[in-house]
Amino acid sequence: MRVLKYLLLFFTASAWAQPSADLVRQLREGGYVLYMRHTSTDFSQNDSRMTSYEDCENQRNLTDKGRAEARDIGAHVKRLRIPIGEVLASPFCRTMESARLAFGKAQAMNEARGGPAQPQDPSRYDGLKKLLSTHVPKGRNVVISSHGNPFHAVAGPPYLAEGEIAVVEPKGDARFSVVGRIRIEDWPSLK
């Protein structure tokens, strides 16, 4: 059992290697899904009283720091000449705002958050798996702005930090592989 734990740690760590010039080159060529967890939020707020996705006053929202992080991510993507096509987002205010600040647009989509099925429904994340596994043509990348839990549910550990991006290679038929991750603090050093 102990050996299994070490192997799992090893393979998880190697699957989540630090970003490199190769990863940036691949992103410039396109064909990937960039799954971004929303940027920094105010954890003193919660979603328990929200009446709809448009009810931003009763949701956990971005902080000023989170807004600046989203703008910075967008500026780095532009600086690195990473082509962005569709920008899909969970309909929550924090994910929509993160996407709009970073990429200038966002299309609300329930599948991006892993819903609307009930939490215990085994098919809850089928729509998200389809988004992550659908072929993206070369020359552009698709962005999904969403949450940490749905991605962890379909891709496994480790959890994405706020503002972290998992670079996903779609493989079709609900299959995909995570080829890298980019933390907020990684962007300035990427070339």
Language model regions located:
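Generic beta-sheet signal
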Residues: 31-33, 137-146
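Active-site-proximal alpha-helix that buttresses catalytic centers in soluble enzyme cores
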Residues: 19-110, 114-119, 157-191
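Hydrophobic h-region of N-terminal signal peptides that target proteins for export
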Residues: 8-17
